[in-house]
Regions:
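Polyanion-binding surfaces on beta-sheet-dominated domains and ring/shell assemblies
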Residues: 2-276
């Protein structure tokens, strides 16, 4: 029998596929340093001294400010300055499933956080023995309600005519999948490794609130703080636009008020009679 010719099989090496770098996107499609959609309106409650409405992502929050007015109960009044009182409350229909209408411990904690963030911006010493009351009602919650509430409250305080050193803007950063992100949504807030809410006065370059939940390295915490401050600056511009839209005022022309400095006052020259 004739043998069939054998053909040698040569191994062909396929060229390796080039790995394309794909920009990392979050669950809602945003970039790591991108804010959610933001809308702020001032003067939305006719019976309040000042008010504001904010939509930050799917968060929908309304704020009313009453005062300065006489403090009740009177024994809680401070003789040298006003008392800033904040009340944060989530409507039963703001989350799914519905929550109890009774104030929770979280509501009380965020109320205290808001007061701490706003107090450094308000000239409380101008209204001794008075109260300034800030009421927050969350109509729909989507993560980051404390920061959104602070943003609305700052605009409402200005709308009430209360003198302030600067507007307070608030934003949170966090870490998810070992990446730092800006303005956490509800999913990122629950599934992330850490979060850092920050409140900031841009013109005065002062941080009025800094919290952190979770674990970050020192370098990550510094980067997260800088990222949050950049987010606050963007929110600050939206706050200004909301006030300019109502009052037609360009706040670039308004300089932040300085605190009393004795060395800035020049002594008047005494007359000759004063030396006699």
């Amino acid at each position: 029998m004739s043998k069939k010719p054998t053909t040698k099989k040569t191994a062909v090496r396929k060229p390796a596929r080039s790995k394309k770098t794909v920009a990392w996107k979050r669950s809602d499609g945003r970039a790591f340093d991108e804010l959610r959609n933001l809308k702020i309106e001032s003067g939305v409650l006719p019976n309040a001294d000042g008010s504001a409405y904010i939509e930050m992502g799917r968060n929908k929050i309304i704020c009313g400010v009453f005062g300065p007015r006489e403090m009740h109960p009177k024994h809680q009044a401070k003789p040298n300055e006003a008392v800033l009182r904040c009340r944060y409350h989530m409507a039963p229909f703001s989350v799914d499933p519905r929550r109890s209408p009774a104030p929770s411990r979280r509501d009380q904690e965020i109320s205290m956080v808001m007061r701490s963030a706003l107090e450094p911006a308000v000239f409380l010493e101008r209204y001794p023995r008075a109260s300034i009351d800030v009421y927050i009602e969350v109509l729909e919650a989507d993560g980051g309600t404390r920061c959104a509430s602070i943003n609305a409250a700052a605009v409402a305080l200005v709308d009430a005519g209360i003198p302030m050193r600067d507007l307070v803007a608030a934003c949170a950063t966090g870490k998810i999948e070992d990446k730092l992100i800006l303005d956490l949504g509800d999913y990122e807030d629950k599934k992330g490794q850490s979060d850092m809410p920050v409140a900031y006065m841009p013109k005065l370059n002062k941080v009025t609130l800094l919290q952190m939940d979770g674990i970050m390295s020192t370098k990550e915490a510094e980067e997260a703080l800088n990222l949050a401050i950049e987010g606050c600056k963007k929110i600050y511009e939206v706050q200004r636009e909301a006030l300019k839209k109502k009052y037609g005022i360009d706040q670039n022309q308004v300089k932040p008020e300085k605190e009393f400095q004795p060395e800035e006052i020049e002594e008047e020259p005494q007359s000759e009679e004063g030396h006699q």
